[in-house]
Each structure stands twice: as C-alpha cells, then as structure tokens.
Amino acid sequence: MIQELTIHNFDVEIRKDRPVVVELYTTNCNHCKKLSGILDKLSQEAEDTAYFAKCNVDTETVIQQRFDVTAVPTLLFIKDGEVKNRLIGEVHPLVIQEDIKKLR
C-alpha cells in the first residue's frame, strides 16, 4: 500500500531505512493516474527494498513549493531524507527500478 503524505507526516515518512519513492501528483492529471497504477504494482513487488508514498500537490502547496514542482507527475527518489534524483512525467517501470537500485 502506498502511503499518502501531507505536510504533517512528510518529513517523518521520507526518513526510512530503505530508499523512498514519492509521487507528487494532482487529481486531474491523467499521466499521474497512469503512473500511480505502475507505482502500485512496483510497491507490491519491492515492498522489502523500497518505500513508496504519494503527495497531492493540489492540496499540499507547501510541499509543492519546497520541492519546486512545476510539472506532474514528479517522482522524488530519496535516501536518508535527501532527494537524490527526480523524474518528471510518465516513466517506464524499468527506469524506476533502476533508480531505486542506485539508492541502495
């Protein structure tokens, strides 16, 4: 299951003992919906090696500004609470898997 993040739990949830993948999305974005389906599947396959979360930047504008989100979907790849990589737009699952491997 992918955790929904808000300003209240964001900083705690991105500090995991494994790589963290955060999808920054909006509710009316078709590309975001497609990517969410991909991430749901990947989160089940990789639940022991990566932590998946998402954040609606329509409602969490502080997070949108903090990470300078200008397009959605945006994926943040985080290790030790620090963003190590960012991908924008629809992304192939293999690219996401490779970026997770780089964080280990």
Predicted regions and their residues:
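Short loop/turn elements that flank and shape the SAM/SAH-binding pocket of Class I
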Residues: T59-V62, L94
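Short active-site neighborhood of thiol/selenol oxidoreductases, capturing the structured segment around
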Residues: R15-T27
